[in-house]
Amino acid sequence: MGVAVGDALGMPTEGYTAREISSKFGMVREMMPAPEGHFHSGLTAGQFTDDTEETLLLAESLIDASGFSPDGFAEKLTSWGATWTLDERLNRGVGFATRSAVESMIRGKPWQQSGLNIPTCGAAMRAAPIGLLYHTNLNIVKSYADLQSLPTHTSAAARAGAVAVAVGVALCLTGFSKEMILRNAASQASRLDEYFAERLLWVGELLDLKPEDALGVIRNSPLAAETVPAAFYCFMRFEPEEALVMAASSGGDTDSIASIAGSLFGAAKGSRWIPESWLAVLEGRERIESAALCLSELSSSICR
């Protein structure tokens, strides 16, 4: 649920600078529709983007296969991509790497060859279900978080971002402190990309700065080495609701930053912290709750 509310909260501000958001919206404390002329124009308050859609596709592939199946996940992505030919709006603002990879799979290219060497956050933003399902075994979390990246993203940074998010979610579920979660997520990610891991670990040194200063130096583009550290900063620095408000108001890839932060808080604290005003308008709530429940039940059987 944290992924979806973060995504929907950050949806209308994606692509704006922090200054533009302040001028157009103020602090983003409630769900809002995408502005006219925005690339999410047409989405209403509470609707989510590709971040949540891909997270759900991964979660539902895990449920269908009673575990991770790269073939099954690739099939989910391909079926989703096929809907774009009927209605372009159904891609929900999908990123370039994922769009190109999915279109390649639709044309028959196997998932082992479809991914692009682009260091963006598309694999990280959807990785939370791996951490949820396999949270008692970090080796499996790391392996499968990396593997689920490959149909769309093959760069070291993109894969490291996915590992960091999935490991973070897993450790949130097992009750680690925020400091230990950050260190372990960076350590696991370092085996794929040292630079990414250094930037993630650096977040711990920025917690005494003003939030706008810290997020300004972390930056907030769709690069995994910016989006993922920004999300972890919000997780480390704030309580859940305020973390998502800050993520949605900070500029850049706001929906991904807020959704990743939401995934960490969802694992750590469940959904009790989510304002009812957010949940009341959230798209697909029944589908999201069903997937979360099924994953939790499946995890209980796998992790015994």
Segments from the language model and where they lie:
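Structured, active/binding-site neighborhoods that engage oxygen-rich ligands
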Residues: M1-R304
